[in-house]
Design a protein with these regions (language model features):
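Acidic-aromatic substrate-binding/catalytic surfaces of carbohydrate-active enzymes
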Residues: 1-19, 24-25
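Structural motif
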Residues: 12, 19, 49, 76-78, ...
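Beta-strand-rich recognition/accessory modules
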Residues: 51, 57, 136-212
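Acidic, contiguous internal or C-terminal segments within carbohydrate-active enzymes
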Residues: 54-100
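Extended, loop-rich substrate-binding clefts of extracytoplasmic carbohydrate-active enzymes
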Residues: 24-74
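Active-site/ligand-binding surface loops and adjacent short beta/alpha elements
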Residues: 87-93, 98-159
Length: 212
């Protein structure tokens, strides 16, 4: 998810006192960035890794590009996203939206969840709740995050500050690391100077333990 992650209220990005309208991909809001439907160019490939590059597309008013490196290691997959401003400064955010088959067990323990308002947008109000039957943003994992799928334990880690958990589907669960909360591109954005980058990583590891 680049150059924003999660929902953007009403699809409007406000930057330097100007409003920019984004496509309403999750009406009445924009969501999940502009590059999930973009064509990517392979810039490097090996037996165990690939690096992809895409521009942020015409739907993003500030230009810029993103690279995604995916590397298979002995016991985990390492993903690294790097979004780079072009000729103009811009707000930026990155994240991933992996879908997993419904886990038979999950250990997703966080310090707190950020409440949503009546429009489904994250607020700064915190509460303590389990990450079960939710579509919400969480902060500060209190233990390694893990899910068990088809008897294999997966451990999820990232240098992202926020995690969105979507657990409402009967067949799947999403555990999504993001560099900020939904709509943070307006509320408290990271601003990139021309040519500057924001880079984050996400690991999906398997322990080798088969859990029945």
């Amino acid at each position: 998810m680049v150059p924003y992650a999660g929902r953007v209220r009403s699809g409007v990005v406000r930057f330097n006192s100007l409003d920019y309208q984004l496509p309403l991909t999750l009406p009445p809001h924009a969501a999940h960035g502009t590059v999930f439907a973009q064509s990517w160019t392979v810039v490097d490939i090996s037996a165990s890794s690939i690096e992809l590059l895409a521009n942020l597309g015409s739907q993003w008013p500030f230009g810029g590009s993103v690279s995604h490196r995916i590397e298979l290691r002995n016991d985990h997959v390492r993903l690294e996203l790097s979004v780079t401003a072009g000729d103009h400064a811009m707000p930026a955010q990155v994240g991933w939206h992996p879908w997993f088959r419904k886990p038979s067990h999950a250990s997703l323990i966080f310090e707190s969840m950020l409440q949503r308002d009546g429009h489904g947008i994250t607020t700064a109000i915190r509460e303590q709740t389990d990450a079960v039957n939710v579509d919400d943003c969480f902060i500060n994992p209190l233990a390694p995050l893990s899910i068990t799928v088809n008897g294999v334990e997966l451990v999820l880690s990232s240098d992202c500050s926020h995690w969105v958990v979507y657990d409402l589907s009967p067949h799947s669960t999403c555990v999504e690391p993001q560099s900020g909360a939904p709509n943070e591109i307006n509320d408290s954005p990271v601003i990139l100077a021309p040519g500057e980058s924001l880079t984050k990583w996400f690991d999906i590891a398997w322990t080798g333990r088969l859990i029945h």
